[in-house]
C-alpha cells in the first residue's frame, strides 16, 4: 500500500478507500484488504494522539450519537448532512457492535478522520473497549471476515480515542455522562492515552454513566457499572464550569433525541430501528454559529429502501439558542 514519507496513507489511496466504502449503499458488504485496514488504524491512532483528549471544537458542527454498526444509517446521515468535508462532524462513540456492518462503519469514519482531520472528530464510546466488543459482535465480525489479529489492531486504535469535546467553550460532549470524580475540565485533559477503560472512576463514568430523572445526586446504575446522576448534578456542574449544555449518547431514545434537566442535557442516538428490536428514530444535532440547536430526525428506513432517502428526515428547529 502506498504511504507518504510520514507513514500516512496518500490522499489518492484514501480517496479510493472512501469511494469503495461509499459503494456499499443498499447493504452491500465492502471488503477492504487487511493491510488497508491496518494502515487506517495506525494512521488514525497517530492523529488521535496528536489532538487533545478534550477536543476544543467550534460551531457550526453536526453531532451524531451511537451508530452501532448500522452502516446504511451512517450513509443516510452523511447523505442528509453532507459528506465530509462539506460539513463538520462530531461523533459521540459506539461505532461497533450489535449491527451487521461494524467494519464498514468504523473504516469509513477512520478514513474520513485521516483524510479530513480537522473536519470530523470521533469520541470514544463504551463499546470502543475490548472487554465489551469481544462480546457484543465486533470481535466475531473481525474473526469471521479477517482474523483476531485485526481485532487487536482496532483495540490499539480505540485505546487512543479522545473521550470528550468542548464546543465554543459552552457545550460539553461525551458518550456517557458526568462523574462524581469530575470537578473541572482539566481532569479530562489530563487523562493519558493510550488507555484501557477501567471498571470504575472518572474515565469509566464519562463513557458509562446515565442521567436519571427519578433521583437527586448520584446512584448506582442498573447497568452494573458506573452510576446515574440527577438533574441537580447537571445544573451544579454546568454552573460551576460556566457551561450551557451537556450532549451525550449511550441510551436509545424514542425520538432520536431527548432533553433532561430543563434542557441542560440532551441525549442523541443516531441508530434508527436500533438492532431491529426498537421502533426508535435516529437524530442528528446541528449547532449553528450562534449555538442554535436543531434536530434532524431520521425515521427507520423502509425495508424496501436500497439507498439513502432525504425524505426520511424531518427537521425540528427548536430555536434552542445557547448564546442568548
UniProtKB/Swiss-Prot annotation:
Enzyme class, spelled out: hydrolase
Pfam families in UniProt: Metallophos, STPPase_N
Organism of this sequence: Arabidopsis thaliana (Mouse-ear cress)
Cofactor: binding details: Binds 2 manganese ions per subunit.
The protein's name in its UniProt record: Serine/threonine-protein phosphatase PP1 isozyme 8
CDD domains: MPP_PP1_PPKL
GO BP terms: pollen tube growth; root hair cell tip growth
Positions annotated to bind Mn(2+) 1: 66, 68, 94
Function: Serine/threonine-protein phosphatase that possesses phosphatase activity toward para-nitrophenyl phosphate (pNPP) in vitro.
